[in-house]
């Protein structure tokens, strides 16, 4: 079987189907039909589909191959039609081609090859929803239905290098209170001035623990709002902080430390998007090194954050093409990805 041609044809079909986050039903339907027509037993939960290699044995470790089928909405500036796949000069253009359709089809066809050979592990392929919005009806909900997972490959555009660690995300809504007064008189307590002290702390503070792969925790104040009119001293100032955690702190630990240092009332929108890190001695990581894959820590978030087990983020394409006009994937990147996934995992003992 020519897996590359089949993978490219499937990606072309996927591009024609709108699959914005939380609206993935039609592309999930299409993938389900594609697999059932080829004799695979497909399971489904909402807009997530998965299949297992034959002969599942609970005594063996289980390896998950996962990528997402949702896309962002097309940005301004597209010259080509985002839902019309076009191949020009070895590139396939279309929305979701790079992020992360190429990973979906490459992992799927690697699954087909690997599951046809004897392996020392169970293999599951899952195409999941809501990754782009860190939704709760994607991989997070699906993991409750799957057997225990020992390791996962998460397909995202990394040029087929291996992200063994990933920064987490916590968004903070912060509110500082003052006292209203007339701006012409020396009265009131300016909430903006109180907030400035907090904001300077967020700008300059360095947490003690620095990760070898991910570096320091990064905090950025990204939004601020205060005041009702020019002549009233504001009694309230609200601001938003984007916190990118490393694996040496949980989000709850960081939240507690931050609350001890600032005047604002601080509420986290969520603490569930944790930083992750896989030991460099893990057999899959060691195998990736042997294939001359660069081992690195990723500053960007993926479904890896929702996986409470060892994982590696690796997929065809380049992250700089994601969420851009005229998004594309090189055809040779899909061919290379299928080959590398197979060489990475075929015959490997993933126990650690």
Predicted regions and their residues:
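A structural signal for short hydrophobic beta-strand segments in well-ordered beta-sheet cores
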Residues: 42, 85-87, 221-224
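Acidic/histidine-rich catalytic neighborhood of metal-dependent amide-processing enzymes
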Residues: 104-171, 175, 352
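Short glycine/proline-enriched coil/turn segments at helix->beta-strand junctions
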Residues: 36-40, 45-47, 59-60, 116-120, ...
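Predominant activation on well-ordered alpha-helical scaffold segments within soluble catalytic domains
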Residues: 12, 32, 105-108, 112, ...
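Metal-dependent amide/peptide-bond hydrolase catalytic core
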Residues: 2, 164, 173-352
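Active-site metal-coordination/substrate-binding segment of hydrolases
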Residues: 60-124
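Hydrophobic/aromatic beta-strand patches that form the interior of the parallel beta-sheet core
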Residues: 63-65, 126, 153, 312-314
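N-terminal helical capping/dimerization or prosegment-like subdomains
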Residues: 1-74, 236-240, 254-257, 331-342
